[in-house]
């Protein structure tokens, strides 16, 4: 998911997306441990998506605090 698309989401949607990404990361790590993971690069991409979501959530919090 692109950063621009994430910025258009509400905080509730971002929280939901963050929970989905954390669950996906858990499953990917489990697959890696059992040797079933086909694309190890997916772990890195999911971690970066989690960081993007957290960053945007924090930006929104700071924006609301200033207002």
Swiss-Prot record:
**Signal peptide interval:** none
User: Would you say which domain of life the source belongs to?
Assistant: Bacteria
Q: List the disulfide bonds.
A: none
Which BP terms in the Gene Ontology apply to this protein? translation
Stored Pfam families: Ribosomal_L29 (PF00831)
* Keywords, ordered alphabetically: Ribonucleoprotein, Ribosomal protein
Which GO molecular function annotation, any one, does this entry have?
A: structural constituent of ribosome
Q: Name the PROSITE patterns for this protein.
A: RIBOSOMAL_L29
Give the CC-aspect GO terms.
cytosolic large ribosomal subunit
For this protein, the record's Gene3D superfamilies field holds:
1.10.287.310
Q: Give the family, as the similarity comment puts it.
A: Belongs to the universal ribosomal protein uL29 family.
Protein name as annotated: Large ribosomal subunit protein uL29
